[in-house]
Amino acid sequence: MVEMESAKSVLEPLAWLMQMITGLLMILLVTAHFYVTHMTTHDALRYAEVVERVAQPEFKALYALLLLAVSFHAFNGLRAILLDTNAGMRKKGAVSALTTLAFLLAFFYGLYLLFSI
């Protein structure tokens, strides 16, 4: 029987800590996003309202931080899943490089879209 390792044992301590921090940060930011878009007014989801809201610097900062947290959390989690496999552990450097590259591409593309509004 193959013994499985937990994500905590596969990830380095800093990567595991960042996974926990980004998870908690996402709870706060998604709650704020949900409140603003669904609880304040029924017009909050109209295109004009969304563009007006996202044009404000504080909302750009909120969404940029949410984008950073979600992107890191997703690709760090994917890295942990891949490192749980035998093939992933044999190619640990490649797995780390590819997931880091994917994180950076997703984050910077998201920033480009956010700031092009």
UniProtKB/Swiss-Prot annotation:
Segments on the Extracellular face: 37-61
Subcellular location: Cell membrane
Note on cofactor: The heme is bound between the two transmembrane subunits.
InterPro entries cross-referenced by the UniProt entry: SQR/QFR_C/D (IPR034804), Succ_DH_cytb556 (IPR014314), SuccDH_FuR_B_TM-su (IPR000701)
Listed cofactors: heme
Single GO cellular component term: plasma membrane
Pfam families documented for this protein: Sdh_cyt (PF01127)
Top-rank taxon, per record: Archaea
Pathway: Carbohydrate metabolism; tricarboxylic acid cycle
UniProt record, GO biological process: tricarboxylic acid cycle
Topology term for the membrane: Multi-pass membrane protein
Molecular function as annotated in GO: electron transfer activity; metal ion binding
Parts of the chain on the Cytoplasmic side: 1-15, 83-92
TM regions (residue ranges): 16-36, 62-82, 93-115
Keywords: Cell membrane, Electron transport, Heme, Iron, Membrane, Metal-binding, Transmembrane, Transmembrane helix, Transport, Tricarboxylic acid cycle
Role this protein plays: Membrane-anchoring subunit of succinate dehydrogenase (SDH).
Assembly mode: Part of an enzyme complex containing four subunits: a flavoprotein, an iron-sulfur protein, plus two membrane-anchoring proteins, SdhC and SdhD.
UniProt-recorded name of the protein: Succinate dehydrogenase hydrophobic membrane anchor subunit
Species, as recorded: Archaeoglobus fulgidus (strain ATCC 49558 / DSM 4304 / JCM 9628 / NBRC 100126 / VC-16)
